[in-house]
A protein has these predicted regions:
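A short core secondary-structure module
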Residues: 149-190
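Glycine-rich flavin
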Residues: 47-57, 61-159, 174
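Beta-strand-enriched cores of mature, soluble protein domains
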Residues: 142-144, 170, 196
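Intrinsically disordered, low-complexity segments enriched in small/polar residues
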Residues: 9-11, 170-171, 194
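Compositionally biased, low-complexity repeat tracts
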Residues: 7-9, 177, 192
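Short, intrinsically disordered, charge-balanced linker/junction segments flanking boundaries
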Residues: 190-197
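Alpha-helical interface subdomain recognition
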Residues: 2-81
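Short low-complexity stretches enriched in small and charged residues
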Residues: 14-22, 103, 135, 164-169
């Protein structure tokens, strides 16, 4: 399922970002809900939609997005402390939520054209990022043609986009490159059958 529309705005339509302390308090406040949904998350093998809805409504996916681009402008210390707090409710949910928040940090460090594409509708994206370079990307006009199979795409069920590590071969030498694609351009195989994650 896709994340719900972003509702983390005041009545005037201006987002009110959280400070570091407010973000940690929000994460601590998520603990009872995460405890109550831990069994459901285990059975579903993904975050319950109610959890995604709460994170989206809070604006927390904006955590690492720079404030001048519509985010909270917080740093890695904040996401670490928030993740630690949420883990008291459900470690696997805290892991997944933090992964989905973290990948906006990569976008924030990318070129403006990337930010414009991914943040066109809202100033964050929900995106997994498998790290192993198990696919290839061939340069084509306007981008790359990617092919491969990537595993462990944490949170892909709720994603808009995916970011994958690929091998780009130029002049016979493979180079590791991160490439992005809309979720609509990939096939998701439901192969995640594990416990405790």
């Amino acid at each position: 399922m896709k994340p719900p529309p972003d509702t983390a705005h005041s009545g005037a339509g201006i987002h009110q970002p959280m400070t570091h302390d407010e973000a940690v308090i929000w994460a601590e406040g998520m603990v009872p809900a995460l405890v109550s949904r831990a069994s459901e998350a285990e059975q579903l093998r993904e975050l319950p939609q109610a959890t995604i809805d709460e994170v989206t409504a809070s604006g927390a996916f904006r955590l690492l997005v720079p404030s001048d681009l519509g985010g909270w402008g917080l740093g890695l210390r904040s996401i670490t402390e928030m993740t630690r707090a949420m883990a008291h409710g459900c470690m696997s949910s805290a892991w997944t939520i933090s992964f989905l928040m973290l990948h906006n940090w990569f976008v924030a460090r990318g070129p403006k054209v990337l930010q414009d594409d991914l943040w066109a509708e809202r100033p964050y994206v929900v995106m997994p990022c498998p790290l192993a370079p198990t696919g290839t990307a061939t340069p084509v006009s306007g981008g790359y043609n990617m092919t491969g199979r990537w595993q462990w795409a944490t949170g892909v069920q709720h994603a808009d986009w995916v970011m994958v590590n690929t091998l780009v071969v130029r002049d016979g030498d493979p180079e590791s490159r991160y490439c992005l694609a809309p979720l609509s351009d990939v096939t998701v195989d439901d192969v995640w059958h594990t416990s405790g994650m």
